[in-house]
């Protein structure tokens, strides 16, 4: 082998360094003293721009050193050296010119003595040995580099480093990181290509990069920043999904202040580059589509694809260094094959098609060729190549990452009516709302109603009714006018005639469910023809009156929840007459006042809540008003209409109706309203007494309503009593007052013997509440428990009710069907936790029974505990 391809290491200037695998040398440092090989064949080392990277070496020819050729400068070498220029003269000395020139090595003289030829042969043999040793060292270094893990700053966006990475030293445009021992030469070459392309692009654009961006005196790795952003789908996707904090943390800047600076630097330095690359990608796709259409007719013959010219645009950089090139081509070009299977390429591959990943390992640049329409460089192919376009199924979510759960809740959130809040209203003019209510214009009234509904519906804010009392007057006027319009077409009926026809709450609820199930939309053409008649105009007025009346009482209901507003409503002289008038209208025309069963049910509930909140301030003026109020309250009783034709029967039902809070939610407010009316004034009691004297059937219906909430005696009754404590207090208070209205012994006996025995069941419940250890602890541990029994008032009212019923039964000489056994009474008397006052009351009850033997004879096995 001759010496044509070798040049001694001493002939090269020391100002230029050629780092090996795993090493990096600056331009002014000392380089290793081994001979350099300039060759383009595989198995050698090519010297390019500041480093000597190992090319793709064939494993079958590791020692193929004889087929080397002299070094030829690549055109990409001049392109990749924007700020440096070298000139090697023929003798290897520094020339200092402004261009890059590599002259051929010196040829030996043709006339060499025999001694010199011998020395040259020995020197050539030594050089071959050194070259083989160098090749082995480089292979070992290459394997060591491949076994290393990728640095943390090269992972994807979704990866979070467990330990915060220390910012690297300031990189230059030629080195991506200050610590070169952690980066492969392929990464350094990729960084160089990226920075050269970026600087060239910004200079051509007219916005040159004058300074390198830094955050907290730490330079930003622009290539890594660009790769992370493009891997996430581009800057738009990063901003849309708020990936900037993750990208900043991946680059070593986790502070919140660095995020805004990072976004600013990206928009200034890399955003134009990204837009140009995307535009080039679109142009490339259109060209490929045109080629595919052109080659559709000649797919049986091999195609000759012209070679792309080398450019400095972002398109050329990504086409040469991208790792996600066309993966569907059967015979890729040699350049792409080298990039894809190079061992020095990064190991992280982006899964997104449109996001450019990290630049791959550097490859041997090819000389530029001019592409013409008449001539093209042929590609050797053993089989015909058919264009296969990249296919992707259509995303029904348009790119949004929606899973099944999010899609399921998406329809529910869209279909649900979003009510505005007080914040959405801004400044509200109450005087303008009052004028709108008094204008008699339907649109103005509707707008004012909607605003007032929003203002009064907020539970965190109380509408100050005392500061704007004109609103109450305006609402009363609107409700009065609407009620007049609805009653103008309805006949008047007698109260006693409609008492048996008055539907209960359960019947109204059933009618509402039937109406909803049978709902059907009317024909549009028929609606247009009906709107031309006079009756249709009246129907529209009636519909508007119904909606306005419902809105007014919803507003009154919301206002009545606050005590300050209750006083303002009661002090208005027109409010109570309006309420009584609506109650009478619902009693007379329960099913015909409003056309819709749902509106009828809503109006019943709103009027009951208003009456429940304000009844402690009402004084019933006469018996007629008291009768209407009582009939309206009794309509919410849990009494089962299937077992009786009318609500006022001659005989009581066989059992007390069962109360369930889920199915009878408005029985409690009805009892509360009746209790407040009884406790307000003696005049109310007098009016109720007159009603019960004239018609005892009302008294039986009221007893069924009050007795339904008293739980039956069983093992769960104590827990039920704890949950219903406020309702039980009101119910027992009303029972004690209602029993005082009873004057007939037969009626009292019927109440005591109804079902399995209401008298016995109540007495057992009172015994349980009085003697339970958790409610009345022993005296030695009394300090650990509350001193007052929470059921004390219930027990007192219950004993008063039992005493009154027992006295009425004794007056009529009527025997009870059941009575507690003597063993039960003895157990209560001997219990250490039984309350003393309750024992005295029990003793008095037993003494009043007269003959104890008679009481024992009335006991049976059914009533035993």
Swiss-Prot record:
Q: Where does this protein have compositionally biased stretches of type Low complexity?
A: 121-139
Sorted alphabetically, the Gene Ontology BP terms of this entry are: chromatin remodeling; positive regulation of transcription by RNA polymerase II; regulation of transcription by RNA polymerase II; transcription initiation-coupled chromatin remodeling
Give the start-end ranges of region Disordered: 1-34, 54-92, 116-143, 163-183, 288-380
Q: Which residues form the ARID domain?
A: 188-278
* Sites bearing Phosphoserine, chain numbering: 852, 855
Q: Where is the composition biased (Polar residues)?
A: 17-30, 328-353
Question: What subcellular compartments does it reside in?
Answer: Nucleus
Keyword Calcium among UniProt keywords: no
User: Per the similarity annotation, which family is this?
Assistant: Belongs to the SWI1 family.
What is the recorded function of this protein according to its Swiss-Prot or TrEMBL entry? Component of the SWI/SNF complex, an ATP-dependent chromatin remodeling complex, required for the positive and negative regulation of gene expression of a large number of genes. It changes chromatin structure by altering DNA-histone contacts within a nucleosome, leading eventually to a change in nucleosome position, thus facilitating or repressing binding of gene-specific transcription factors.
Quaternary organization: Component of the SWI/SNF global transcription activator complex composed of at least arp9, arp42, snf5, snf22, snf30, sbf59, sol1, ssr1, ssr2, ssr3, ssr4 and tfg3.
Recorded protein name is SWI/SNF chromatin-remodeling complex subunit sol1
**Native source species:** Schizosaccharomyces pombe (strain 972 / ATCC 24843)
Gene encoding the protein: sol1
